[in-house]
Amino acid sequence: MLFTIALVGVVLGLAYSLHIKIFSYWKRKGVPHETPLPIVGNMRGIVKKYHFRDINQRIYKKFKGQGPIAGMYMFFKRTALITDLDFIKQVMIKDFSYFQDRGAFTNPRDDPLTGHLFALEGEEWRAMRHKLTPVFTSGKIKQMSKVIVDVGLRLGDAMDKAVKEAKVEEGNVEIKDLCARFTTDVIGSCAFGLECNSLQDPSAEFRQKGREIFTRRRHSTLVQSFIFTNARLARKLRIKVLPDDLTQFFMSTVKNTVDYRLKNGIKRNDFIEQMIELRAEDQEAAKKGQGIDLSHGLTLEQMAAQAFVFFVAGFETSSSTMSLCLYELALQPDIQQRLREEIESVLANVDGGELNYDVLAQMTYLDQVLSETLRKHPLLPHLIRETTKDYQIPNSDIVLDKGILALIPVHNIHHDPEIYPEPEKFDPSRFDPEEVKNRHPMAYLPFGDGPRNCIGLRFGKIQAKIGLVSLLRRFKFSVSNRTDVPLIFSKKSFLLTTNDGIYLKVERV
């Protein structure tokens, strides 16, 4: 009995000592920081009372100007919130070799779809990035844009149908789901080579599965937050994050698609085809004894993981950007009309008035409107980089130890009045060429920057632009009695999303 009591005392003592060591880190470093609470650190109220961007804002506002970083604790994870734009450039570009990992959760052994490019680390990430970069060249995006334009036509038809049905509700149309169905059909075709038909059928299987990725959780939101802020510990515990049936759905979809194409000699200009070709190149090189390490090659599981993240990142981010853009344009009819006039003017000089990849480059105001949407509504509240070795902050005595997270508070930078006066105002002129030239390059980071920026940023922007043009050339958007002004955003979702649908009054032009 006494031995048991003594053992419990020793364990509790060790736990207390470890707790003190972790939560005194920034104090010992002499870095300004908020006093942490036991276990949760500075995450008190997360997902219930606060979103990540709210906690980041509190710390950013309190400590900006006191040094390049402010210390915080994301549960047990020691995190440096960066408040200095020059130091952000050091982390993301100049000293990238110290910060090449994201510290994101990945557990391919137990949860194969988490072995995707966004989360991979070190040489695994470098090898996969090298393989996938050719998939997202301008030439490849141009080929895929033809599919996106076709889906855009169906989007216009689906909106036309929604407008007819909405007459009984004073023209109210819920645009958030419609935009998500558009991007689901685009990604389904461009990534998997499948006709999802969710624009015609809102209950289509791919649309349902896409929705479930964000609405179904294997764990509570609090546990999810812990997993994603303590990724390595979660991996050691062999935790999974995706429901098994969703994993099985995407794994079988990729396997069946690959098997069918190889068996029947079918080729398409899509993401799956590019990965099939990359896999074949690896196998051919290995046969010739060129030293290709197939453990870094594209196994079926790796192919499924890359297709999965392409689907998740491609449909949710672009659809949210589109719906938020239309919302802002509904509030600013003059901006909406100027954009529509640009669209009509450019397309008037195209044979048949047909939209294509090349004419999008002529729509400069569209680019400004989209950029301002992503400035005001960045879909990720922050970017994370993890120190892969000890790093001394330039012109400072502060050394960030290996494993410390560096947090770039994107949302808070985008809403800093010293960088963007009247940050809550939607103003595309912020992205006039001269304005952009005079602004710090790290003041705008919707897609990150440096070697680990978003590999699919060009695809995402083209998809959103084609969707917006397809709608704005045919329809006018305005606020209605069901439009939330301001919008109410979810505190539970890591990505920026509204609690409810976005309702606008929609009329034919």
UniProtKB/Swiss-Prot annotation:
Keywords associated with the record: Endoplasmic reticulum, Heme, Iron, Membrane, Metal-binding, Microsome, Monooxygenase, Oxidoreductase
InterPro entries per UniProt: Cyt_P450, Cyt_P450_CS, Cyt_P450_E_grp-I, Cyt_P450_sf, Insect_CytP450_Detox
Positions annotated to bind heme: 454
EC number(s) recorded for this UniProt protein: 1.14.-.-
One MF term in the entry's GO annotations: monooxygenase activity
A Pfam family this chain is assigned to: p450
Record-linked Gene3D superfamilies: Cytochrome P450 (1.10.630.10)
Subcellular location: Endoplasmic reticulum membrane; Microsome membrane
This protein's GO CC annotations: endoplasmic reticulum membrane
Chain segments annotated as transmembrane: none
Cofactor: heme
SUPFAM superfamilies hit by this protein: Cytochrome P450 (SSF48264)
Topological type in the membrane: Peripheral membrane protein
The protein's enzyme class: oxidoreductase
Entry similarity comment: Belongs to the cytochrome P450 family.
Function: May be involved in the metabolism of insect hormones and in the breakdown of synthetic insecticides.
Protein name: Probable cytochrome P450 6a14
Name of the coding gene: Cyp6a14
